[in-house]
């Protein structure tokens, strides 16, 4: 296989959650540009349709499913509907996430439960529903979005950090279970990127600069910085890589 074809996603179908904005939208657009047909999943329908239209306007193939991943019935319905557009997904990207920023003593049961349902549970149940079709093909990719907080604690982010630590270990478990069937499961752990999820930090210049200063590169991430890693983990280029978490954080986690 030529080097260019190693990274070519033509003929593949990717399902991406959290695709109405931020990291999910950036990954969906990158996959479409690399040749994949993309099924974009999110809760906010208007933003989701706009994201789909952008990909289609650029010549890509995209469709969307409105889904509240915190609701199990909605998640299962999404898995049922996904193959209707372009066929069964070959690639699943779990990029949806929330971060309820409260001091630990102020967190409610609902804060905890909703964070875990969206950030961790969905990353288990959605691939579980879609993996049988990948197993039948003998090829598939799961790309989970972990976090710098998978391995580091930050204030007022307790449930988020716990959920992302779980995502990192879930990735290993998925790899152990399914790699023998041709499904490679890996995770991307982003550092600080300007997204709706990080708005409280982005909107505080002092905090934003402080985070940048902790990287080796000297800046926080731009969404384009994730495209290469996301395509790599979804393509034949990563055929012998599974159960790994790649930190895309400018060296923050290595410091």
Question: Which sequence ranges carry the predicted segments?
Answer:
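Substrate-binding pocket helix/loop in short-chain dehydrogenase/reductase
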Residues: 103-104, 108-116, 142, 207, ...
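Active-site helix of classical SDR
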Residues: 127, 163, 171
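C-terminal substrate-recognition "lid" of short-chain dehydrogenase/reductases
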Residues: 124, 139, 219-248, 253
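Alpha-helical segment proximal to the catalytic Tyr-Lys
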Residues: 132, 176-180, 239
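Conserved glycine-rich cofactor-binding loop
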Residues: 13, 20-21
